[in-house]
């Protein structure tokens, strides 16, 4: 076991705060509409330019191990806020730095750190309740557009794209961000249910120009097993052939004699058919087959519930308005399933999302909800260079998360105004003793920090603006982009309540832990002896 370096009291805290300040100073220059860029060197490729606080925070690692501990703790603030709300990482870092720097003055003056932390916690609870009470619902797409624009550093085109995407696929729909191939941003929307499985054989394609199989008003057969024997399918095929409608078969696999017979019948025009592998694996495949069944009004033919393929009838098949199958994807548009059954299935999956502890599982369940409830929208980012593309993608990701948070918990006045207004909720609030009251006052001063930083980044005088905003009422605040005062909601400067709340809660939590730290321990690096010179190889004499 290697030897440890141990620091106590003020010497430990001063090192930790030095690390916090290095990271926070690097992150906070990105805050606000006139936030600056941070250029990050890469060991390979071009440098990365970003205005995203969490990206900057993740890049910072300090040589001094005690300082690095402080930096990593405050980095946790931005990461946690990013995980919960998807945005507000810079605000959280600025708040953590302000609470810590205010708090350390009181600790140095001899106050009890535990009581200070209790006071900070009391104040945070009061401010969070205040934010929740003043939040306005973000129902209309105008509000969504404004939130998206603000979060993307006042880029209105990004806000419009996100609002359009949400309008198309609904607030529950899946919206993904990808790097595009052109200069302009674009929005692609896939309506209906799409899954990443294409036709089993290219001979099923009936549109040779696009190499897709398009089926109008088809029957849909869902089978939870491999099909290799054509005899199992004959009764269903004959029944469908009599109707003259096409047939889509979704099964674990279709192979051998069964596949060959389907291909031949399709090519001869006896029956228009296409076979596709079921999406997912194991239990997830069973669940997704059930989703498709509910969406299309079909019954999954499964031996687990005592159903055999030979006994399947037209009543067991689902239908849809149109199905398009390409080499890699299948899209089912306008399934004929019962609307009430679909809504019930969506509720069921949402309940599973609430219970799930795995981020991956939650993401997959959310995708299933979107496929049942709406569709999938893809925002394709356009840019002139790869560096610009990556920077823009960071901003669009932030904006997308912010709009989701706004839909969830509503919006408050942006630009740090909601926090400054929350000071009024702390008027007359006292703790159980003087030290706790001092903790409440620490937060009272610290929550001005985001507005101060936004103003400083815009090149204006923070104290003048803070006083002007404090003298105003309601949503009155300062628009750093234009240098004007006015109603923040009317000017379209909104922040999601969830982002503001999460930033404050996580900042206060980590800052409180740092204030109550009395000892820090780290490894002493071992001085490894230099490797000895390599001796010459024997037996090599006489070579020219």
UniProtKB/Swiss-Prot annotation:
GO terms for molecular function: ATP binding; ATP-dependent protein folding chaperone; isomerase activity; unfolded protein binding. CDD domains: GroEL. It is found in: Cytoplasm. InterPro entries: Chaperonin_Cpn60_CS, Cpn60/GroEL, Cpn60/GroEL/TCP-1, GroEL-like_apical_dom_sf, GROEL-like_equatorial_sf, TCP-1-like_intermed_sf. The keyword Nucleotide-binding applies. Its EC number is 5.6.1.7. Keywords: ATP-binding, Chaperone, Cytoplasm, Isomerase, Nucleotide-binding, Stress response. ATP binds at residues 30-33, 51, 87-91, 415, 479-481, 495. It catalyses: ATP + H2O + a folded polypeptide = ADP + phosphate + an unfolded polypeptide. GO terms for biological process: protein refolding. GO terms for cellular component: cytoplasm. Signal peptide: none annotated. PANTHER family: 60 KDA HEAT SHOCK PROTEIN, MITOCHONDRIAL. Belongs to the chaperonin (HSP60) family. Together with its co-chaperonin GroES, plays an essential role in assisting protein folding. The GroEL-GroES system forms a nano-cage that allows encapsulation of the non-native substrate proteins and provides a physical environment optimized to promote and accelerate protein folding. NCBIfam families: GroEL, PRK00013.1, PRK12849.1, PRK12850.1, PRK12851.1. This is Chaperonin GroEL. The lineage of its organism: Bacteria, Pseudomonadati, Pseudomonadota, Gammaproteobacteria, Moraxellales. The gene is groEL.
């Amino acid at each position: 076991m290697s030897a440890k370096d141990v620091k106590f009291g003020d010497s430990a805290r001063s090192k930790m705060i030095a690390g916090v300040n290095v990271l926070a100073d690097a992150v906070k220059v990105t805050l606000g509409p006139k936030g600056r860029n941070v250029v990050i060197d890469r060991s390979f490729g071009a440098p990365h330019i970003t205005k995203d606080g969490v990206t900057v925070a993740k890049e910072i690692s300090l040589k001094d191990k005690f300082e690095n501990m402080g930096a990593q703790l405050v980095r946790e603030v931005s990461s946690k806020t990013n995980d919960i709300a998807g945005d507000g990482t810079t605000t959280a870092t600025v708040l953590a730095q302000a609470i810590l720097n205010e708090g350390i003055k009181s600790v140095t003056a001899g106050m009890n750190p535990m009581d200070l932390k209790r006071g900070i916690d009391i104040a945070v609870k009061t401010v969070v309740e205040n934010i929740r009470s003043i939040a306005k619902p973000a129902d209309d797409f105008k509000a969504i557009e404004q939130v998206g624009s603000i979060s993307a550093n006042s880029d209105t085109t990004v806000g419009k794209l996100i609002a359009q995407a949400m309008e198309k696929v609904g607030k529950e729909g899946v919206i993904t961000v990808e790097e595009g191939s052109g200069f302009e941003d674009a929005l692609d929307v896939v309506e209906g249910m799409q899954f990443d499985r294409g036709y089993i054989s290219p001979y099923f394609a009936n549109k040779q120009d696009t190499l897709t199989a398009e089926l109008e008003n088809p029957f849909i057969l869902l089978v939870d097993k491999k099909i290799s024997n054509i005899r199992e399918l004959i009764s269903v095929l004959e029944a469908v052939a009599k109707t003259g409608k096409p047939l889509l078969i979704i099964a674990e696999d279709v192979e051998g004699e069964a596949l060959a017979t389907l291909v031949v019948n399709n090519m001869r025009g006896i029956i228009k058919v296409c076979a596709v592998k079921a999406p997912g694996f194991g239990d997830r495949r069973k669940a997704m087959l059930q989703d498709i069944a509910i969406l299309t009004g079909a019954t999954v033919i499964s031996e687990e519930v005592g159903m055999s393929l030979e006994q399947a009838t037209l009543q067991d098949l689902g239908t849809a308005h149109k199905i398009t199958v390409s080499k890699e994807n299948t899209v089912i548009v306008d399934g004929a399933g019962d609307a009430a059954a679909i809504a019930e299935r969506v509720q069921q999956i949402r309940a599973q999302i609430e219970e799930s502890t795995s981020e991956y599982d939650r993401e997959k369940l959310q995708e299933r909800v979107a496929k049942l409830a709406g569709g999938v929208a893809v925002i394709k980012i356009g840019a002139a260079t790869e560096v610009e593309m990556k920077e823009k993608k960071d901003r669009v990701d932030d904006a997308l998360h912010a709009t989701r948070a706004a839909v969830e918990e509503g919006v408050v006045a942006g630009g740090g105004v909601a926090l400054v207004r929350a000071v009024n909720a702390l008027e007359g609030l006292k703790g159980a003793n003087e030290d706790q009251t001092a903790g409440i006052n620490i937060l009272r001063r610290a929550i001005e920090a985001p507005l101060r930083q936004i103003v400083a980044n815009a090149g204006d005088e923070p104290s003048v603006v803070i006083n002007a905003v404090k003298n105003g009422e309601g949503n009155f605040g300062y628009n750093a982009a234009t240098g004007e005062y006015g109603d923040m909601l009317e000017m379209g400067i909104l922040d999601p309540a969830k982002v503001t709340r999460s930033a404050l809660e996580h900042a206060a939590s980590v800052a409180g832990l740092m204030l109550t730290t009395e000892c820090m321990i780290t490894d002493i690096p071992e001085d490894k002896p230099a490797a000895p010179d390599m001796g010459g190889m024997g037996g090599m004499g006489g070579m020219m």
